[in-house]
Design a protein with these regions (language model features):
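Aromatic-residue detector
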Residues: 25, 55, 77-83, 99, ...
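Conserved non-cysteine loop/helix-boundary elements of the Radical SAM core domain that shape
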Residues: 1-79, 85-88
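C-terminal accessory region of radical SAM enzymes
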Residues: 80-116
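Radical SAM enzyme core and accessory elements
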Residues: 102-207
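General N-terminal targeting signals
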Residues: 38-40, 66-71, 76, 101, ...
Length: 207
């Protein structure tokens, strides 16, 4: 079928409340460039995909794409898992960027505690995903195993530096994840000697 039909079908599946949709992007496909990968992540985030997985193309023995690799301009490793090394449309360095981008997705978008904040950040600010990617790379964090708490602190620090208008949402995400109120993301939360008013307007949640 047509690509537009497939996208509409995916969008519909993502809209179903009783179904969690995992969408896969494959770096190294012919005609697929790095900038298009970034664009597709934003598209899938706008559909509210439950998870966005980014993997590298593998040319398995006996497959049609492997037989046509030279014709398609694909270079791949002769050793398992036979990953694509470069194509006419994406360089070896860009494939490494895509691998690191997949780490960002797993650390933040695919982690329930930080997913909604990450989604809102990258959708409301078209350059945010690039900024977050560079921030994690420059601080040598993107390829490190990090705890849920550490990832939350990093995201809060990123918002504080680059998108301060999201600090309240970052603090709320931190609290909802059950993190400590003594850590930096809860620095603006007042807990001592606080008396609730007799009446208040509920701005968030159900009470």
């Amino acid at each position: 079928g047509k690509l537009t039909d497939a996208l509409e079908g995916l969008k519909f599946l993502c809209s179903l409340e009783n179904m969690e949709t995992h969408a896969d992007l494959i770096a190294g496909l012919p005609l697929y460039r790095l900038n298009e990968i970034f664009e597709d992540i934003l598209t899938l985030a706008s559909y509210q995909a439950g998870e966005i997985q980014l993997e590298s193309l593998k040319l398995l023995p006996g497959t049609e794409m492997r037989r046509k690799a030279d014709e398609l301009g694909i270079s791949y490793s002769p050793l398992p898992p036979y990953e694509v090394l470069q194509t006419n449309d994406i360089t070896t360095e860009e494939l490494e960027e895509a691998r690191l981008l997949s780490r960002l997705l797993d650390a933040y978008y695919n982690t329930p505690a930080w997913q909604e904040l990450t989604r809102r950040l990258i959708l409301q600010n078209k350059d945010c995903i690039h900024h977050l990617f560079l921030y994690l790379k420059e601080h040598k964090l993107i390829d490190q195993p990090l705890s849920l708490e550490r990832r939350g602190i990093i995201l809060y620090e990123f918002c504080k530096q680059m998108y301060p208008e999201f600090l309240t949402e970052a603090s709320i995400a931190w609290i909802e994840a059950g993190m400590s109120l003594k850590k930096q993301p809860a620095e603006r939360v007042r807990t001592k000697r606080q008396i609730p008013p007799e009446t208040w307007e509920v701005l968030y949640g159900t009470y």
